[in-house]
Amino acid sequence: MDTTQISRRQILVVGSCNTDMVIKAAHLPRPGETILGGTFFMNPGGKGANQAVAIARLGGSVTFICKTGSDIFGHQSQQLFEEEGINTSYVFSDSGNPSGVALITVDEKAENCIVVASGANANLLPSDLAKAEEAIELADLILMQLE
């Protein structure tokens, strides 16, 4: 599918939204080992969010359904999606749970270990999807992940 085909379709992504906290290290720690890392950075992430952003950057018309916490990570994600031109009408905020985060350690060979705290992602409920019924019905393509 080329970008012309993508721009003509209504694409709906249902999925996760995380903040990736990445630290680079010489090697991955073994159980019980504490090591000193190098560079640390944070990126928006989550398989669903990554798909939605990629589609938007290819010129697609994309709506994203997800749930974030009503914390700084959730607010930053919402802002990023809006800047990317993603329809955020169904980015739900959960005041009772934090946004999802992924703690990622990457070694010199680009091997990684990832621990995900799903947070509000785990509380995306059928009742939330019911609120997005119109967007679901209008979608030409629906993407979902197993994260």
For the regions a language model picked out, list residue spans one by one.
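Ribokinase/PfkB-type carbohydrate-kinase core domain
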Residues: 2-17, 75, 79-93, 97, ...
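Glycine-rich phosphate/adenosyl-contacting loop at the front of the ribokinase-like
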Residues: 1-67, 72-76, 82-86, 139
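Residue-level marker for the onset of beta-strands and adjacent loop->beta junctions
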Residues: 51, 99-102
